[in-house]
Amino acid sequence: MKEFDTIAAIATNLGESGVSIIRVSGDKALSIVSSIFTGKNDRKLDDIRTYSMRYGFIIDKDTKEKLDEVIVSYMKGPRSFTAEDVVEINCHGGVVVTKRILEEVVAAGARLASPGEFTKRAFLNGRIDLSQAEAVIDLINAKTELSAKSALEQSEGKLSREIGKIRNKLLEIIASIEATVDYPEDDLEEVTSEKGRESVSKLLDEIDSLLDHADEGKILREGLNTVIVGKPNVGKSSLLNALLMETRAIVTDVPGTTRDVIEEYMSIDGIPIKIIDTAGIRDTDDVVEKIGVEKSREKINNSDLTVLVLDNSRGLDDEDKEIINFIKDKKYIVLLNKMDLESKIDKEALKELNSKYIIEISAKTGSGLDKFKEVIKELFFSGKVASKDVMITNTRHKEALIRAKESLEASKNALDNTFAIDLASIDLRNAWKSLGEINGDTVEEDIIDKIFSKFCLGK
């Protein structure tokens, strides 16, 4: 285990609440907190047992004034989250008292932790690997139960074990090839090449199996970026409100009411959907509305799915056609809204749209919305949302797997030529290194720092 100084931070949201927690980690954690703690009969924390709690007060070290009534818990390393001695002060929630206690902890010798530093220490101390550390923040940020389940499984090491198995198999192939290179025999080289090709083919199948559902995994982690577009007053905001089952956007008969982008999350059978309601796209002289229209175009360009809303009670006009032309190369669904009104739209003209999904809905009555949700599942999850044994949810992991696959394919080509068997060993080591980036064995330090910088304070 590495040696670090003792760090402290508020581990809960800072605000009015029932309880706040100040977390302290390091070899001096217990002595630091003990110096500002007084229990019943002036009892300190010197004799506290690991995995136990003690009632008392946090005091101002200089004035001996009581700051708050607390319960202190102690976990002796390495059997703690960071694999170090960890003390947690459970105090009353509230900004003033929580900050005041943290100030006393720092004054007593601790250093303020940087974002994600507790989890980073767990990684550097070998308690978790990098993919497990990333799963911690994914679990915190999960928007649906399915997202949370996927993150929890990764935090428990499911992906780590799978990657570890593949890397161990790679080492066996490398050892076999390098032994053949060191002790060359013509017939042995041929046998090694043949066995190596078979083994590499099996590993390629395993990596392909992991990559097969990576796009689905990314959606579970980040949400399906879904942009609602259309000209003003076709019912985009009404659709957003209907999907969320609450009044989130202002709805009026005045075109251009929505002038900015509104983003909210919803769940479709566990799929986190990031719904983005945009300003109606049209030519306008209004400066504020014009900014909203430009934002709408940006969101469309960065979307996973575009939802084009057309007004069934009116025919297609030039504004509709301009939007259709703008999104024609995107993956999009067409919603014919206001089906509760008389239909005036030209259905034949709609057949020319580059979308096989044209759904009749009424945002006002909710008619057709279930069909819309089923189509989203069909488009991105083949109609069924199922948790796979091991799900690749992180783009960084996907890219590492792709690099490993490319190296394995290169090694297979080298093994086809027994004269280049030593080159295969180089490619196999590159694949092993790429896979090691997933669990952190071979990743660069700046990437590690970047990953943990995305964490919140106290985690």
UniProtKB/Swiss-Prot annotation:
It is found in: Cytoplasm. Keywords: Cytoplasm, GTP-binding, Hydrolase, Magnesium, Metal-binding, Nucleotide-binding, Potassium, tRNA processing. Disulfide bonds: none annotated. InterPro entries: G_TrmE, GTP-bd, GTP-bd_TrmE_N, GTPase_MnmE, MnmE_dom2, MnmE_helical, P-loop_NTPase, Small_GTP-bd. It comes from the Bacteria. K(+) binds at N233, T252, V254, T257. (6S)-5-formyl-5,6,7,8-tetrahydrofolate binds at R23, E88, R127, K459. GO terms for molecular function: GTP binding; GTPase activity; metal ion binding. Its cofactor is K(+). Mg(2+) binds at S237, T258. GO terms for biological process: tRNA methylation; tRNA wobble uridine modification. Its EC number is 3.6.-.-. Its main location: cytoplasm. Residues 223-381 form the TrmE-type G domain. GO terms for cellular component: cytosol. Binds 1 potassium ion per subunit. GTP binds at residues 233-238, 252-258, 277-280. Belongs to the TRAFAC class TrmE-Era-EngA-EngB-Septin-like GTPase superfamily. TrmE GTPase family. Homodimer. Heterotetramer of two MnmE and two MnmG subunits. Exhibits a very high intrinsic GTPase hydrolysis rate. Involved in the addition of a carboxymethylaminomethyl (cmnm) group at the wobble position (U34) of certain tRNAs, forming tRNA-cmnm(5)s(2)U34. This is tRNA modification GTPase MnmE. It comes from Clostridium novyi (strain NT).
